[in-house]
Amino acid sequence: RQFLAFELDADINSDVHDIRSKSIKEFEKIGFPDKKHEYWKYTPIKKVLNEKLTIFKKKRHLIEFEKVKDFFLGGIESYKIVLIDGMYDPLWSNTTHKGADICILSSVLENEKYSNVISKYFNKIIDDKESFSLLNSSFSKEGAYIHVPKNVELDKPIEIIHINSGGESSLMLQPRNLIILEKGSKAQIVESHYSLIGNNISPYTFPGYIDPLTNTLTEIHVEENANLDYYKIQNDLETTSIIDNTYICLLYTSPSPR
């Protein structure tokens, strides 16, 4: 039912809609992993899969700059894509289309201008038998889109900042990033997860509060002689669960991402 509601306003003739439909059908066959799966043998995933989790936010939560700026790289000018509870916040973001595309994924997925790029790179290198990758492909709506053209070296790093406002309980967030570095290009990216509430959550301080479950998927395509430094910082609540699948396609002369 959540999938049908999610796709209610979608273009049913789009390639992205086809990907979502195929992914949810495959997920329904496979389901969530259990201890029989080698990679999940020692991870009790059922403990974080609460039946009350939902992909739908009730409202947008506005955050003061004084709180957001604490999560920025100190003293460094950067491009920024800020996502609060999975929703893009244009107020505190700094995106661009000058020389490179550094913006939100939703702005390109259904844009005819980017159709060739999306058909070439989007959802091409994921494991289509991995449960959480399928779940992300079914429900992801927002994230970062970064495309650095041939021989372009970015003048400053990129920050992808995920913030849990604490204003909503029981959210299952599905961030999706698509990153493309063409031949001879260079970029530095820092992806981080933070929370505005402390680690002292209890049924007494936040009655009925259920920690968000973040299921992130990132596709990275690095062409010949391109150079990518990619950093991940997970500094959310101790009780928050983050599932992160990062898929990288390196063409043969590309140095490995650091």
Label every PLM stretch briefly.
Residues L91-S254, R258:
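Conserved beta-strand/loop scaffold segments within soluble protein domains that form the structured core
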